[in-house]
Amino acid sequence: MAKKSMVAKWKRGSKYKVRKYNRCHICGRPRAVYREFGLCRVCFRKLASEGKLPGVKKASW
């Protein structure tokens, strides 16, 4: 989990528009964030397995 201070800092916005930091919208994790969904791999997997992400299904071949 991200530190509460980092999440608060991220939600507040930045001084410059160039400073964009990809974080998970749910937990605030800074790494392994899917841009298309705005979620980290952990939250993505959890929501996808629960069926809460439309158009996402488990791969099988």
Curated annotation (Swiss-Prot):
Q: Which GO terms describe its biological process?
A: translation
* Chain residues that bind Zn(2+): 24, 27, 40, 43
Kindly give the InterPro entries that the UniProt entry links to this protein. Answer: Ribosomal_uS14, Ribosomal_uS14_bact, Ribosomal_uS14_CS, Ribosomal_uS14_sf
One Pfam family assigned to this protein is: Ribosomal_S14
Spell out the NCBIfam families in the cross-references.
Answer: PRK08061.1 (NF005974)
The family annotation for this protein states: Belongs to the universal ribosomal protein uS14 family. Zinc-binding uS14 subfamily.
What is this protein's name?
Small ribosomal subunit protein uS14
